[in-house]
Amino acid sequence: MKQSKYKYIAHSENSNGAEQSMKQHSESVAELMRSFALADDFAEIYSYCGLLHDIGKYSKGFQNYIRSREEKEPHAKWGAYIALMNKLVNIAFPVIGHHAGLPNRDAMVETLGLCAKDENRWKNIQQAMEEDYFIISMCDNSSFNKIGNVFQKELFVRL
């Protein structure tokens, strides 16, 4: 597979001097999340949370921050935005809250509404994902509907 000319990174150099690419990070977190699934029916939806959680790190602002410690740019909202655009509200909650904790629904909708207005940044993230050959085929709500009762769904959102 062809490699991107620009290396999008998720994490700066560790103690061994190695950076972690965005694609590698997202795919490894997706696999880790899949392993946390309590049942096979939940594996797909857990995996999508892992894929989406750091998508905002593809933005130019975040890439500048991670390389030079310039102004920090929030990133969690962009994966949640993708989930919401695909009508996966229950995936949006854990994705947007993976650093700051779960927002209430109104706060999340307000934040994601701001994403919708920031067309330039959204296009930048999409373009970066394409350049990095990082494609996400979204699941549908049927994956979430396999989670049996309301208590299991609540546990998923808070996991």
PLM feature spans:
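Accessory nucleic-acid engagement/destabilization modules that flank
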Residues: 2-159
